[in-house]
Amino acid sequence: MTDDVTGSVADAVNEAMADVVDPSLGFDNELAGLLGNKAKVALIVTRLASAELLAAFCQLSDISAACIGANQGAVAVLKNLDGDGPEAAAKDLTTVVSGMAVILAVNRADKLEVAMYVQGEAGQSFAPPVLFTSTPRFVEDLMLGIVTLNQLKTQGFEVVDSAGLDHDQAMQILANHTKRGRGGRGSRIE
């Protein structure tokens, strides 16, 4: 009888810890996330029409991200979560794509931070609920760890990895999304 009780207690502890520590991340990564040295998740939210276009912009800005398409705007799930990597990505993207405003949402040590970036500068910060009311539902779910990128893929969301594009492919995507790229003069990129 004692073994059954011990076994059930151990199972209960393991089940409770599964919510706290994701074994796929490893102990060091999980500890860095809890201490705030590494973000648990960071998203760049845009008003761009497609995941492919956002992935092209990320590739040209040297940002490693998985970009998800949505009606309200494409979202980049950043891969560099160390230190100020997410903030640097938002600065780089809005510097390379002049005039584009993005929203950076970061979950660091279970604290959600949301700020707008324009022209390479951090602007207004605001409460996460404000972001969640104007973005696809999966943004909140990703930020809180309720859903994973793989789950979104299986649900049919368009996901494009910026690392899967080279410079020429990114430039061709830009050409395809511009007025001139739809068959007008100068639509080819050599």
Regions found by a protein language model. Name each.
Residues L25-L149:
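Hydrophobic alpha-helical segments that drive targeting, anchoring, or assembly
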Residues M1-N29:
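Acidic, serine/threonine-rich intrinsically disordered low-complexity regions
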